[in-house]
Amino acid sequence: MKLCIGLCDDNPLHLRMISQEIQRLCGMREIEAEIHTWTSGAQLLKEIETYDIQLYILDIRMPEITGIDAAKQINLIQPSAQIIFISSYLEYFSDVYETEHLYFVLKSQMAQ
């Protein structure tokens, strides 16, 4: 099985760590992961039709376009795509309900 994943986080270190964790988890389940990364919501939305992303993992707090605003556009453009929000800030938990999404995960709990 192949899973096309879009990962967006404005922190390059977090982007790399999350990408590695996704690769590890997919490897454990024998899922081939094709991961595309962006460091801004604006960059992601410019390239949204370039790839057939099945799962987006979005940081919430980013400059210009937040992960929540990006998710609203993803919901319109690719309604079958699934979305997981990640954040270091619990204060954004209730904001994710403005969009269709699967989960909200705190970055500190990613490995669990």
Language model feature labels by segment:
Residues K46-Q112:
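CheY-like receiver
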Residues L7, A33, L45, D59:
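Generic anion/oxyanion-binding catalytic loop in active/binding sites
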Residues M1-G6:
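Non-catalytic signal-transmission and effector/linker regions of two-component phosphorelay proteins
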Residues D9-N11, S88:
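Acidic di-acidic motifs
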Residues T37-Q43, G67:
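Helix N-cap/capping motif at the beta->alpha junctions
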Residues P12-H36:
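Two-component/phosphorelay signaling modules centered on CheY-like receiver
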